């Protein structure tokens, strides 16, 4: 065993992508064991690796961790991406939970029925422009630092960049009215570990397309 975290999930973004982002931002190398068929998932279930019979699952520090939030909290705490005190952690948690709501909206568009896709995406992009991005523009303005919390990189910054890029895949000019978020995106994208993760050939996964859904359904259903 190499000692690197091992990520068990399908070869897709899904609920593991934020884990990949956070490990990459922390400069932590990790391995991936992809579920390719239903039997791969069944094996993890039957050998007791999945506490609640679900992936994502991450092997780290002798544990087999499940539940995405628990995994992210552990990684953030272990690699000093979770603020310096309880108050900073509370802010980070608030920002991250809000971002998770927006990310979920964007991520779920691909699985909407054909006649609902356009409406669903329009709703998600409207919420990005009018509910979520204005919040983070104001946070950056009021806080007056390069990062959302304190004056160093936290998981909130990592998840904000991940979410911005996901929104821009559907609306490239999504940040047109948000100059501070534009600067934030440019700044954080150039942090060496993140810049490396954004290069072709990294372990970052492409956007889920409709053609990928049957493959995933065969594993998970």
Swiss-Prot record:
One of its GO terms (biological process) is xenobiotic metabolic process. Residues 85-208 form the GST C-terminal domain. It catalyses: RX + glutathione = an S-substituted glutathione + a halide anion + H(+); prostaglandin A2 + glutathione = prostaglandin A2-S-(R)-glutathione; prostaglandin J2 + glutathione = prostaglandin J2-S-(R)-glutathione; (13S)-hydroperoxy-(9Z,11E)-octadecadienoate + 2 glutathione = (13S)-hydroxy-(9Z,11E)-octadecadienoate + glutathione disulfide + H2O. GO terms for cellular component: extracellular space. It holds the Pfam family GST_N. SUPFAM superfamilies: GST C-terminal domain-like (SSF47616), Thioredoxin-like (SSF52833). Keywords: Transferase. Glutathione binds at residues 9, 45, 54-55, 67-68. Gene3D superfamilies: 1.20.1050.10, Glutaredoxin (3.40.30.10). It is an enzyme of class 2 (transferase). Residues 3-83 form the GST N-terminal domain. Its EC number is 2.5.1.18. One of its GO terms (molecular function) is glutathione transferase activity. Homodimer or heterodimer of GSTA1 and GSTA2. Glutathione S-transferase that catalyzes the nucleophilic attack of the sulfur atom of glutathione on the electrophilic groups of a wide range of exogenous and endogenous compounds. Involved in the formation of glutathione conjugates of both prostaglandin A2 (PGA2) and prostaglandin J2 (PGJ2). It also catalyzes the isomerization of D5-androstene-3,17-dione (AD) into D4-androstene-3,17-dione and may therefore play an important role in hormone biosynthesis. Belongs to the GST superfamily. Alpha family. This is Glutathione S-transferase. It comes from Gallus gallus.
């Amino acid at each position: 065993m190499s000692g690197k975290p091992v990520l068990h999930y399908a070869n897709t973004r899904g609920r593991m992508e934020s884990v990949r982002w956070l490990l990459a931002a922390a400069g932590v190398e990790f391995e991936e064991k992809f579920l390719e068929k239903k039997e791969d998932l069944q094996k993890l279930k039957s050998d007791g690796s999945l506490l609640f019979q679900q992936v994502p699952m991450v092997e780290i520090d002798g544990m087999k961790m499940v539940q995405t939030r628990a995994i992210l909290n552990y990684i953030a705490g272990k690699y000093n991406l979770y603020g310096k005190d309880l108050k900073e952690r509370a802010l980070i948690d608030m920002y991250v939970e809000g971002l998770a709501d927006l990310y979920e909206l964007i991520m779920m568009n691909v699985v909407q029925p054909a006649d609902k896709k356009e409406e669903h995406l329009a709703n998600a992009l409207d919420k990005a422009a009018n509910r979520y991005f204005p919040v983070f523009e104001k946070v950056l303005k009021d806080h007056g630092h390069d990062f959302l919390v304190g004056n160093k990189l936290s998981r909130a910054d990592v998840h904000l960049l991940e979410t911005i890029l996901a929104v821009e895949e559907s609306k490239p000019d999504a940040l047109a009215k948000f100059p501070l978020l534009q600067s934030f995106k440019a700044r954080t994208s150039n942090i060496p570990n993140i810049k490396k993760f954004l290069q072709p050939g990294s372990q970052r996964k492409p956007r889920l397309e409709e053609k990928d859904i049957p493959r995933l359904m065969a594993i998970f259903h």
